Amino acid sequence: MKRKNLLKILVLFILAGSIVNAEYLKENGEIYYEMPYFEVKSKVKEADAKSFKSFEGRNKTVMDSYYGKDNKNVYLLGKKLKNVSPKEFEILNEDYIKDDKNIYKVKLEEALFFSSNEINTKKISVDGLDVKTFRTLENDKEIETNYFGDKNSVYYIYENIDKIKEADRNSFKILDYYIAKDKNN
């Protein structure tokens, strides 16, 4: 577990340090993903320039600027995310994304290899979780948090998506990154 967390931290440092100026570009009716640090500029295969949208500038998660979508596909670091629909696509945090039907875990380590044009995702299923209403819980501090909720329950995401069984969805309030309260606790 410690090794896995260390690897994840290392990957995030590499991404943050070396792809800090990376961006999607529209040129001559084509979409490109540019990483100036590596002096790499590659065409995003199958991307539709007319409907393409980058998530850069959204500033909800560290990963926002690495994602883009068009009317057919979702892309991470210029590579197509396999089986992810652009319909209602949302970046939940560094490891998890969702579309209109499913929640997925993204293998960030896989995204760093430049040999493939597609990135595999792992579909996540949690008993009772309503994907349509699953969202990041709002907080007064405007901090990125690992607390999420659907219409009925509260969840905490770290390595997995865990339901907080005794949490009251209606009174749940985030106090800080790891600290929250509800009427029961």
Where are these predicted regions, by residue range?
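Hydrophobic h-region of N-terminal signal peptides that target proteins for export
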Residues: 12-20
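Non-catalytic tandem-repeat scaffold regions and their flanking low-complexity/translocation tails
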Residues: 19-185
